[in-house]
Each structure stands twice: as C-alpha cells, then as structure tokens.
Amino acid sequence: MGDISYVVVFPTVFSKNKIPQLITNIKKILKIQNQEFKSVKRDGDVILVDANDPVFSSAAINLLFGIEKIAIARQVKNDFQKVVSEITTVGGNLLLKGERFLVKVEGTSKGFFTKDIEIAATSNIIEKKANMGARPGTEENFDKLLYTYLTKNNGYVCIFSDKGQGGIPYQSQNKNAICSVYDEISAISCFETIKQGFDSKIIICYRQKSELMNLVKMINQIIPRLVKQEVVLEFFNVKINQAGTRNYLIFVNSILEIMLHEAKSNNISHVSLALSPLVFSTNFIDYSMKRVFQKDRLPIMPLSGVDTKLFEEAKEIGLEKQIPKLEKLFQINSNEIQNSSNKDVDFALKSKKSITVRIGPNNVHDILDSLE
C-alpha cells in the first residue's frame, strides 16, 4: 500500500439514502474552494475522496450538511493482518509519550470480528511503543482514539477525524424555501433550514445601519453552505422601534409579510419561520402559520423541537458571545398577536437592495461595501 491519504466522508443516518446528492455537493464545494481532486466515489456506506490536499479538502467538505464525521485516512485491503499492521504503524506515529489510546474498529469484517483487530492492534502498539509509556485506555478514559472503518473490500485507518455538521445534503428535499436573518434566533433558523435540505433564498432585514455588521458576520457563516459560487442576498430596511416585546413581535410579523411577498414574486413554495414553541406563544405561532397558508405557501419551522442544541448551532455560526442575548430573547412572555405594520412593510419593500456575493475570504467587506 502506498502512503496516500484519502478524505473519508461518513454520511449521517438520514443521508444514507441521499448519497448521490452528497457526492454532487462534495464535488461542487471542492471546485468552489479551488481544491483539486482526482475522484469522489462511494465505498459501501462511506464516500472516498482522492484529493490533492486532503487537509484543505476535508475542511471544505466539512462545510456541508449530511455528514456525521469526516476523516483523513490511509486505505488498506480488508485483510486481518494488513489492517492490524496499518493501525500499528499509523497509531504508533500518532501517539505521544505517556498517552492512553483506544483502538476502535467498526464496519464489515470478513472471517473475523472487529474486536479481534482491536485486541491485536492494541497488543502490537503496547509492545512497539513500550519505551514511550503508551498504554491502553477505556471507552470512558483515553487521550487518543485510533479509529478504523471497514468496508467490504477496504479498511480506512484514520489519521485525523472531525465531527460533521449533521442534517441532510443541501437541495436533497427538491424544494425551495425563503428565510430571513434579522437577529440571532433567525440566523440559527436559517442555518437549520439549509441543514434540513431546502434550497434556501436568504433575505436580511435590519432596523438601522448599525445592525448590518453583526448581521453580515452571521450571514458569512451561513452562505458557504449553500454550495454555490455566487449567492444573491436581498436587504430590507424595516423601520420599527426596537424597544419592548410588543415592538419585537410587530417586527417579526412585518418580516413575515415581506417574506410572503418575496416568496410569491420568486415562486418559492415554502416559508421558513424562525419560531419555536419553546420561545413564542402558541397563539403567535398559529397566527403566523395561518398567514402563510392564506398566501398559498407552506410553512416550515426548523426550530421546532430544537432545545439546548440551539446553543451548539449558535457556536457553529460564530455566536458564542451572543448567547446571553439569545437567552434574553428566549424570555419573551406574551400571548398577544401583534399585527404587522403595513406602512413599515411598504417602506421595507421599496428599500430592497439586491447584491450578488461571490463566495470568498472577503465576503463581509464585499457585502458591506455593496450596501454603501
């Protein structure tokens, strides 16, 4: 076996029947990120990427949804001795002095149990790295995981692995949706809309220009996941007083009217509502959903059922410092249904500014410059 390292993509359980779409998205994201590759193909339940630069390619691929885990690994034939030998070599090179290690093997075994490989490889590493004080750990207590996955014909001994984004592949629903980003909750909802496989059109609603920097930074964490070289963003100025729960609810319902207008204009079937029963009253949610149905669109609520995991999503789009603000938003306590402001909706629609962003390292500055 040569010393070639591959990128190995592990689809989520929800994506295993959508692997062709995930392969398409992998090829697209590598081209967008200017990462050269020789092939992207399926091997059993995993996807094997032969890339010129596995490190940068794995980082690009891990922007995608539909992935449980991504690894850089060495390929070896699914043969007991060859797999044990490769784990011993790779694992030995990865270990530092005094580290506890855990050998974990999963997948399809032929003529042996995966546990047999784990035991044999662990024994070999202890013997060969005795001078380093390397010792086996347990499932609950280890410093380094030495992970290997077996397909029918091959074994993949991981040098590095990282957690994926979860969800299902972008565009796998074959439906389009409109979502709006106007604060932290709505940004997470937009992130979840894409994560649930919808082809998403994003609009940004702001009350004053001072909000734009923060909103654009959030957008910058979201748009690379749309698997497009260029993304069209639309900005609307919604001039509604920011103070108090009542005004916030008027603001949210006014944005709903803007989304409904844009959904009709662009023939978009689904409207993504940044609402959760954990935050908003049932009355408010029911009103919003009825408004969507009245306009012959279909509502989706990506945040429905998402509880404290919402904070993990917040960190994923760079909102660690905004978590106290999120917690404050969660304390909305009102059963009132505030109607949208027709005057402010009309003003916002007239203020619409559309810009095309070419995905790259300077997205934030490019977007803000285009809005001047």
Label each PLM-derived region with a short phrase.
Residues 1-232, 239-245, 369-372:
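RNA-binding accessory domains that recognize and position tRNA/RNA substrates
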Residues 125, 133, 161-169, 173-174, ...:
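Active-site adenylate/phosphate-handling loop in enzymes that bind or generate adenylated species
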